[in-house]
């Protein structure tokens, strides 16, 4: 049995097989997922697991180069936005790189998310709690 934070075998496998610049989406319960993207549905009930909890577990195993979020999160969900930026700042320090955060319109976010290898669906019931994480390399 693994002793790291992430125990979900399928999610761990997807992170391990991401190539440089390939992406993974972590989303709330409402984001539409393209049929072309593999879905890992972690949602058990409203709020479980939460978006931020899921982000923290995923980034404990993933080397992140940059991220994309919807512009709307800043106004419609400032608490999640601020906590998300804090998590990414801490990750930047741990990794020794600068993780650029790009803001796009929500409609563009949905298009970009359809290009990801996998979507991790949470039980989050708050607006615009979605992020696309792009894989980097630790060298």
Curated annotation (Swiss-Prot):
It catalyses: beta-D-ribopyranose = beta-D-ribofuranose. GO terms for cellular component: cytosol. Keywords: Carbohydrate metabolism, Cytoplasm, Isomerase. Homodecamer. This is D-ribose pyranase. The keyword Lipid biosynthesis does not apply. It comes from Histophilus somni (strain 129Pt) (Haemophilus somnus). Belongs to the RbsD / FucU family. RbsD subfamily. Gene3D superfamilies: RbsD-like domain. GO terms for biological process: D-ribose catabolic process. Its EC number is 5.4.99.62. It is found in: Cytoplasm. The keyword Isomerase applies. One of its GO terms (molecular function) is D-ribose pyranase activity. Signal peptide: none annotated. Pathway: Carbohydrate metabolism; D-ribose degradation; D-ribose 5-phosphate from beta-D-ribopyranose: step 1/2. Pfam families: RbsD_FucU. InterPro entries: D-ribose_pyranase (IPR023064), RbsD-like_sf (IPR023750), RbsD_FucU (IPR007721). Catalyzes the interconversion of beta-pyran and beta-furan forms of D-ribose. The active site is at 20 (proton donor). Substrate binds at residues 28, 106, 128-130.
């Amino acid at each position: 049995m693994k002793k790291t934070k992430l125990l979900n075998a399928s999610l761990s496998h997807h992170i391990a097989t991401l190539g440089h610049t390939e992406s993974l989406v972590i989303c709330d319960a409402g984001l539409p997922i393209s049929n072309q993207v593999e879905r890992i549905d972690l949602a058990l009930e409203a709020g479980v697991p939460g978006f931020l909890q899921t982000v923290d577990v995923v980034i404990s195993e993933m080397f992140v180069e940059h991220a994309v979020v919807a512009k709307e999160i800043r106004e419609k969900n400032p608490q999640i936005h601020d906590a998300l930026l804090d998590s990414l700042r801490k990750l930047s320090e741990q990794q020794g790189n600068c993780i650029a955060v790009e803001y796009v319109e929500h409609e563009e976010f949905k298009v970009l998310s359809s290009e990801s290898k996998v979507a991790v669906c949470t039980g989050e019931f708050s607006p615009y709690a979605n992020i696309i994480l792009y894989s980097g390399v630790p060298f």
